[in-house]
Amino acid sequence: MAPDGVEDSDYESDPDELNRSLATRRREASDDDEDDEEADDHDKLRAAIQIHSDEHSGVVVVDSDDNEGLHIEDSYGDDDDEEEDGDYGQVDDHVEYIADNNDKTIVAGNGTDDSAATDLVDGEEQKKKEPFAVPTAGAFYMHDDRFQELDAASNRRMRGGRRLWQSRDERKWGHDKFEEMNTQKQQYDRRTSRGRGRGRGQGRGQDRGQSRGNNSKEFTGNGHQNQFPKAVTRGRGARRYEVALRNGNQAPSVQTKQSQNSSVEVSHVDLGRPPTETATLETEAIQAKKNVFASSLNSASPPFYPSRSNNNLAQKDVQAGMGRLHINENPNPTGKKFGNTKSSSLWGRTAQTTSHGRGVPPHGQVLYQQSPNQGDKVSSPMQIRGMPKGTDQSCTQLPGQVFNQHSAVISLLPSSPPKTGSSENPYLSGEIESAVETGALVAKGKGSLQPSGRGSFMYGGTQFMGPAGMAAGHGNPNFPAFLPVMQFGGQHGGVPTFGMALPGYFQPEHGTGNPEMTWLPILAGPGALGGSYCPPYTVLDGSYQADKPGLPSSAGSSSQENSSNNPNDEEPMERPEVTNNGNSQRSNSNPNKQPRRYSEMSFSK
């Protein structure tokens, strides 16, 4: 007992206090142990209560094996509490099961049953990560997003094995999508252009809008439909216009040929004439002809007043030609100035051509027919005798032309300016006298210059058209009042040509009459003189032909005799007459109804 005593002697200061301290020391030790265990349990339960607070804080409903709910409460057990609890019966030294009114047991742990409490708490801790552990009630029920991200992400990612938002959010960006759309559109356009574009020119295109182009190709009728690929659409319009021009130029080609022939004729006839003068004559003649046709050529037509420039040209031609006419009898006219000799030869021709008395043709019968190669030449009024019949000079190729008293256009039309220039007489005093000699030379070999039958007659060296026995100075009421014909320059020595006075100005007893009167010398149609005009014409092969083509021209008689009897004589050529289309015309009057015996001539088609 010594050690015990020693210990007692060491520890006890007061025996009473020592006994009391031992008793209390045990209690406090047990209390400390219980407090430690209870503190641990309290911390664990408090965490579980904070997580699983359903109805009120501090109580949690736990499912047990027998499906009874257990209310776990904190027990701050003291000795008094333990004693009071012991009245209900202890199952264990540290854990007491207390039945309440709700058939639920309050479990309080005292440290001995730590494993059971820990298992419960661990089970709750394991359950807190599950979705049902998320609070569905409480202050922040709608704002508790602790598990929403994970839960929503997991559901979003794993539903159906793919993410729900992949189709919308993980697709290409907008610009990538735009490029993809453009790529598809380009592919679509490429396909459609391949199908529709090629089809336009081919089978399908003929059904759609290409019939116009196909019609243009069919319109050609040249067999060139397959010349170009049908898919090529560029030259289609040009080809259509080309076809139109090709078709339209067929008719003008004839006129072009005629104009070319006329230019050739002018070149043959006017070898010595300057081209500018010829052009001037042509233009003036065309204008004069237009003026005459515009007036319908009836008795009410105003007189024709030629311009002074034409007079000058006429005078010049007369002066140059009067002295050369007798030289022109040689058969080869090459090198001669036929442009200058034309007027003089015509002036002298009037006497010879009408001298055979073919007579004035009946009223209403004139045939203006143009030779095929007859052209615009205004300055080729006469052909030299002995010229070949097939030369370009159209005077030998005039088909039978019947002059119509109502169609005496040729006598008035001033296509050759020398004719119009002779309307003023003062300058013709000396040269016209020489023209009389010229007329005699031209008329040689013609036979008698005496009129026979009804028609032309000679008066003062000039052939005068009218009824037989009617002289220039004798007025005959039977003579047509329209466009009368008389001796031109009869007061000046008798010029071998005709003058025609317009209505209201004819004064046969005074010759030319008043100075204002316009006398038109007949340079073209020696027999083409007579009554009023008759406009109707029929065009045959580019020539004018009157209503009654059966009557030959009166002036053709002398030409006929010239060509048949006198091959070396100068054949009379009718005055060229420029029509609206630029082709010259000449008139011959042949009242005897005898067709000319020219080899080139076709009489009245």
Curated annotation (Swiss-Prot):
Polar residues bias located where?
Answer: 214-228, 247-265, 367-380, 578-593
One Pfam family of this chain? Btz
Biased composition annotated in UniProt, kind: Low complexity: 552-567
Bias (Acidic residues) occurs at 1-16, 30-40, 75-87
| GO molecular function terms noted in the UniProt entry | mRNA binding
| Alphabetically ordered keywords of this record | Cytoplasm, mRNA processing, mRNA splicing, mRNA transport, Nonsense-mediated mRNA decay, Nucleus, Phosphoprotein, RNA-binding, Translation regulation, Transport
Which InterPro entries does its entry note?
Btz_dom, MLN51_plant
Query: Annotated region Disordered: where?
Result: 1-88, 101-132, 151-275, 350-380, 544-605
CC terms in the record's Gene Ontology section: cytoplasm; exon-exon junction complex
Its localization reads: Nucleus; Cytoplasm
Quaternary structure and interacting proteins, as annotated: Weakly interacts with EIF4A3.
Name this polypeptide is given: Protein MLN51 homolog
What is the organism field in this record? Answer: Arabidopsis thaliana
Q: Which gene encodes it?
A: MLN51
